[in-house]
């Protein structure tokens, strides 16, 4: 090992032998010194050994078509929204790369995204999948839990803390992450005119979000909660964080109809009404969001608006079977681990989709429906070694009969009588 001091009495790195004048930093330990260059080299070696993948290289952001293609592996339908998101995300990270290289005199502004669509249409899943594609830190926040600073509730800075935690407290990586704020429509002000009284959970939250959406250096308490004097704070620049906000915006279709000067006369079928609402939803413009209750400054920070359609029966059946992480595939795999084959009759899948539509939960409610159907199956099968197959029939999906079990001898019996 190298000596700690040279002839001139200067401290030296114990590993490479460079003096303190030859390096930027020299860190002292118990009887040892290490320079910043050796620390960086050690870090590179460890990352290489462990196979740690770096976050996205912003010089090689996937093209919009590639992003949409990968989104389609996990999200069924919603092609218009996927295209809008793919373009917005590609431009966002291309902008980061451009602004960092400073080769161009033109500084590109940030394009945050507003997703409008019914419950269970895939807003959260789209945002999560985008973060997975880009391998960037990701955080989800619920707008209904937020309040203006100084009032009971969660400060907007706590959203940033979730992102920092997602990046393992690496602030530099967190500064290029994605934040999804759900239920943003719930913080709309109650009327189009500015309120005289303080609206701390509505307009007040929008006002509090303005700066971090636009880009600011925010001070975040490391443990969350309220800020206190003399407390150590984490500084994070939100200028390159992509914000995606989402909400159902119930009733915005009527605002669009009124703007377009159209009225609905008579009573149509549910399907006709659904198609009608989807048509108007796709025509939402910033003016409609203003009428709904978002403040002009907030809308101005959400230049990209993407709408999602209500999922119909066919789309829900596809969601059950087609994506890489489809629920049917997951349950089949779970029973496969117990050496049992699982079969869903096609009509059973249709019944499950109908139930989700009836409950108005969209794709989000599919898992709870299947879980209810599969409860007895998953309770019974691990204790049996004579079952080879489980069949979910149309009647079982409707709750009119129990799932059917096929035994080793080929006989088929309902699960309740199988004990």
From Swiss-Prot:
Residues reported to bind Zn(2+): 13, 16, 35, 38
Alphabetized GO MF terms: ATP binding; ATP hydrolysis activity; ATP-dependent protein folding chaperone; protein dimerization activity; unfolded protein binding; zinc ion binding
Any single GO BP term: cell division
Highest taxon in the source lineage: Bacteria
InterPro entries associated with the record: AAA+_ATPase, ATP-dep_Clp_protease_ClpX, ATPase_AAA_core, Clp_ATPase_C, Clp_protease_ATP-bd_su_ClpX, ClpX_bact, P-loop_NTPase, Znf_CppX_C4
Domain ClpX-type ZB: 1-54
Amino-acid positions noted as binding ATP in the UniProt annotation, renumbered to this chain: 118-125
Cellular component GO terms, alphabetical: HslUV protease complex
Entry keywords, A to Z: ATP-binding, Chaperone, Metal-binding, Nucleotide-binding, Zinc
Record-stated family: Belongs to the ClpX chaperone family.
PANTHER family named among the record's database cross-references: ATP-DEPENDENT CLP PROTEASE ATP-BINDING SUBUNIT CLPX-LIKE, MITOCHONDRIAL, ATP-DEPENDENT CLP PROTEASE ATP-BINDING SUBUNIT CLPX-LIKE, MITOCHONDRIAL-RELATED
Known role: ATP-dependent specificity component of the Clp protease. It directs the protease to specific substrates. Can perform chaperone functions in the absence of ClpP.
Oligomer status and interactors: Component of the ClpX-ClpP complex. Forms a hexameric ring that, in the presence of ATP, binds to fourteen ClpP subunits assembled into a disk-like structure with a central cavity, resembling the structure of eukaryotic proteasomes.
Protein name: ATP-dependent Clp protease ATP-binding subunit ClpX
Upper classification of the organism: Bacteria, Bacillati, Bacillota, Bacilli, Bacillales
